[in-house]
Design a protein with these regions (language model features):
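PP2C/PPM-type serine/threonine phosphatase catalytic domain
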Residues: 1-173
């Protein structure tokens, strides 16, 4: 049964000169993959990191037999392959600050959804317009929140709000 996917993309440049966000959607054989990657602005070639990661994950999805036998395993594999491709990109470019990106990925199949993320790109689970759950950032301020050192309303203004502890292309991802 075909999967009908309705999605909207809103991407704001903010105070930067370029937008390093990338969105990719693929569907076929009753499954769909939705990917959002955000190239890290302080790093060289963040947009290329996001493009590379999206391309690798879409190619893997298109080549995989559907329905996917192990959806969570597929997400793990897709993120791992994207990470390896972005690390290889950084090696080829030979720049001091390697290309990096954060990622949110969602797989829909048989009326079920599985998701994963790396960094501070989030997945929100909505029901009737209300947020039921969201992924927790791999960031310093998220850790402070979990420890009870800051409140959620203090996260946005915290001086370390942009410090990501895990990302595609980074060490330890």
């Amino acid at each position: 049964m075909p999967v009908a996917i309705e999605f909207a993309e809103v991407s704001l440049t903010g105070d930067r000169e370029d937008n390093q966000d990338r969105v990719a959607v693929a569907s076929g054989d009753g499954a769909a993959l939705l990917v959002v990657m955000d190239g890290m602005g302080g790093h060289a070639y963040g947009a290329r990191a996001a493009e590379t990661g999206c391309k690798v994950m879409l190619e893997l999805f298109r080549a995989a037999p559907k329905p996917l036998f192990d959806p969570l395993g597929f997400l793990h594999l897709a993120l791992g392959r994207a990470h390896a491709a972005v690390v290889a990109l950084g090696t080829r470019l030979a720049v001091d600050l390697r290309p990096r990106a954060t990622c949110a990925i969602c797989l829909v199949q048989r009326s079920e959804a599985w998701w994963a993320h790396v960094g501070d790109s989030r997945v929100y689970h909505l029901r009737n317009g209300t947020v039921v759950a969201r992924t927790r950032d791999h960031s310093h301020v998220e850790q402070l929140l979990r420890e009870g050192s800051i409140r959620e309303d203090e996260m946005q203004g915290h001086p370390m709000r942009n410090y990501v502890e895990c990302c595609i292309g980074g060490e330890g991802a």
